Swiss-Prot record:
<feature type="binding site">
    <location>
        <begin position="262"/>
        <end position="266"/>
    </location>
    <ligand>
        <name>GTP 2</name>
    </ligand>
</feature>
<dbReference type="InterPro" id="IPR015946">
    <property type="entry name" value="KH_dom-like_a/b"/>
</dbReference>
<dbReference type="InterPro" id="IPR005225">
    <property type="entry name" value="Small_GTP-bd"/>
</dbReference>
<feature type="domain" description="KH-like">
    <location>
        <begin position="383"/>
        <end position="467"/>
    </location>
</feature>
<feature type="domain" description="EngA-type G 2">
    <location>
        <begin position="209"/>
        <end position="382"/>
    </location>
</feature>
<feature type="binding site">
    <location>
        <begin position="118"/>
        <end position="121"/>
    </location>
    <ligand>
        <name>GTP 1</name>
    </ligand>
</feature>
<feature type="binding site">
    <location>
        <begin position="56"/>
        <end position="60"/>
    </location>
    <ligand>
        <name>GTP 1</name>
    </ligand>
</feature>
<dbReference type="GO" id="GO:0042254">
    <property type="term" value="P:ribosome biogenesis"/>
</dbReference>
<dbReference type="Pfam" id="PF14714">
    <property type="entry name" value="KH_dom-like"/>
</dbReference>
<feature type="binding site">
    <location>
        <begin position="9"/>
        <end position="16"/>
    </location>
    <ligand>
        <name>GTP 1</name>
    </ligand>
</feature>
<dbReference type="InterPro" id="IPR031166">
    <property type="entry name" value="G_ENGA"/>
</dbReference>
<feature type="binding site">
    <location>
        <begin position="215"/>
        <end position="222"/>
    </location>
    <ligand>
        <name>GTP 2</name>
    </ligand>
</feature>
<feature type="domain" description="EngA-type G 1">
    <location>
        <begin position="3"/>
        <end position="166"/>
    </location>
</feature>
<comment type="subunit">
    <text>Associates with the 50S ribosomal subunit.</text>
</comment>
<dbReference type="GO" id="GO:0005525">
    <property type="term" value="F:GTP binding"/>
</dbReference>
<comment type="function">
    <text>GTPase that plays an essential role in the late steps of ribosome biogenesis.</text>
</comment>
<comment type="similarity">
    <text>Belongs to the TRAFAC class TrmE-Era-EngA-EngB-Septin-like GTPase superfamily. EngA (Der) GTPase family.</text>
</comment>
Length: 496
């Protein structure tokens, strides 16, 4: 599972600046949940091929009466859920009582913690850091987050070694890691091959489909989970997954195996109403990372919120297949239903490839139809398409709509091949293809989707240009060119 790093510290010590600095390595703030956690932001970053989730917690204060009393519950939860904690202090302001209170709390938590002294630009670092060694947290990493100084050393010396160990340890886990190992092997296989392979050692359709049921609190995720399990009347048992938070529940339907990833935990149907469904952003993000298909549950009576759109954006950025379930559809008037459909068309137009189902998890109406779309999305995401087929589709798209001129020259697209699966990746080779405008790239993506009939999964297109073999070579004259040049020079001398 993807490791989690929490940034903690007093207010205004530069946590958000470091958060932006780290997430900009991926050039995106992947998940921000406004209104849900006012003092926390979530980002997904990639450094040297290692991915991790970063939490920017709110400032912790109130050391006068003890940090346990005044530390925000969200920040406490972030520390508990994190694998690595970066404790930021202000080197300019010096050691403060709140810093000592936070350090005391962190020493009592069994988490790998690094002390990071920010705002060290323009000051004597050794003098400024002397007092902070009394916190008893070991080595101090001086940085200037606003300018990026020291951040690379922090990444190389602190984060990458721990993240690497975390990933290796997870590979030694059992049960669920067998499926994860398959997908890792499949991705490595896809990077090495640029031509279609006739022989496939792995058939994705024989593996269980990992299905993550995600959504805001109280939209009916657990009710839907229990309904999907109860319909099949199978023996359900809890299978602890690779994380502390998610429960993996195997089930079977129509001869096909599934693994439901329940972020809220499994509860008996009779107790669902008695328990307040808790929402953990970290659980949800990790479930999305680990699944093949994400089932996003939306409350029809509350409409689409910013949290729904944030989750949707994270699913798309992660390249996961998507099915949307609009729950609590029962009991609504026809007029209200039409309004909900109009709102969905307006706000979800950018994910028109995803199937939308109107269901009632409580009564079971429409739930059975979800599996057809889940299977369709998974099949489209893992389907093999040959180079000849992709190249033919590319030529058809080019014939229907010629690419624009770039610096007075026509872009030449030579051939296309599969660059990966889950999500499907199409790699197009040619001249100046990377300079194509975004509008034409969207046209190509939609053309491939329409022709291949890809539903339920995003499709990505990558462009590669061939290098000019003569770019670094001097022009060498042929023998005839040399003789011609000599005659020309002799003629010029005579004319003078």
């Amino acid at each position: 599972m993807i490791p989690v790093i929490a940034l903690v510290g007093r207010p205004n010590v530069g946590k958000s600046t470091l958060f932006n600095r780290l997430t900009r390595t991926r050039d995106a703030l992947v998940a921000d949940f406004p209104g849900l956690t006012r003092d926390r932001k979530y980002g997904r970053a990639e450094l040297d091929g290692e991915e991790f989730i970063i939490i920017d917690t709110g400032g912790i204060d109130g050391a006068e009466e003890g940090v346990e009393t005044h530390m925000a519950s969200q920040s406490l939860q972030a520390i508990q859920e994190a694998d690595i904690v970066l404790f930021l202090v202000d080197a300019r302001a010096g050691l403060m009582p709140a810093d000592q209170g936070i350090a005391k709390h962190l020493r009592g938590v069994e988490k790998k913690t690094y002390l990071v002294a920010n705002k060290t630009d323009g000051i004597d670092i050794d003098t400024a850091l002397a007092d902070f060694y009394s916190l008893g947290l070991g080595e101090i990493f001086p940085i200037a987050a606003s300018h990026g100084r020291g951040v690379s050393q922090l990444i190389e010396q602190a984060l990458l070694p721990i993240v690497g160990k975390f990933v290796e340890e997870e590979k030694e886990l059992t049960e669920e890691e067998e499926n994860a190992a398959y997908w890792a092997a499949l991705e490595a296989e896809q990077k090495e091959q640029e031509e279609e392979e006739e022989e496939d050692d792995f058939d994705p359709t024989t593996l269980p489909v990992k299905l993550a049921i995600v959504g805001r609190p109280n939209v009916g995720k657990s009710t839907l989970t229990n309904r999907m399990l109860g319909e099949e009347r199978v023996v359900v048992y809890d299978m602890p997954g690779t994380t502390r938070d998610s429960i993996y529940i195997p089930m079977e339907r129509d001869g096909k195996e599934y693994i439901l990833i329940d972020t809220a935990g499994v509860r008996k149907r009779g107790k669902v109403k008695e328990t307040v469904e808790k929402f953990s952003v970290i659980k949800t993000l990790q479930a999305i990372e680990d699944c093949n298909v994400a089932l996003l549950v939306i409350d029809a009576r509350e409409g689409i919120s910013d949290q729904d759109l944030s989750l949707l954006g994270y699913i798309l950025n992660s390249g996961r297949s998507l099915v949307i379930a609009v729950n609590k559809w029962d009991g609504m008037t026809q007029e209200d239903r039409e309004q909900v459909k109009d709102m969905l068309d307006l706000k979800l137009g950018f994910v028109d490839f995803a199937r939308v189902h109107f269901i009632s998890a409580l009564h079971g109406s429409g739930v059975g139809n979800l599996f057809e779309s889940i299977q369709e999305a998974y099949t489209c995401a893992t389907r093999r398409v040959g180079t000849s087929m992709l190249t033919r589709i590319m030529k058809m798209a080019e014939d229907d709509h010629q690419p624009p001129l770039i610096r007075g020259r026509r872009v030449k697209m030579k051939y296309a091949h599969a660059g990966g699966y889950n999500p499907p990746v199409v790699v197009i080779h040619g001249n100046q293809v990377s300079d194509l405008p975004d509008s034409y790239k969207r046209y190509l993506m939609n053309y491939f989707r329409r022709t291949l009939q890809v539903m339920g999964t995003p499709i990505r297109i990558q462009f590669k240009e061939g290098e000019n073999p003569y770019a670094d070579k001097k022009n060498k004259l042929t023998a005839s060119q040399i003789r011609k040049r000599k005659r020309l020079m002799a003629h010029l001398k005579k004319s003078k």
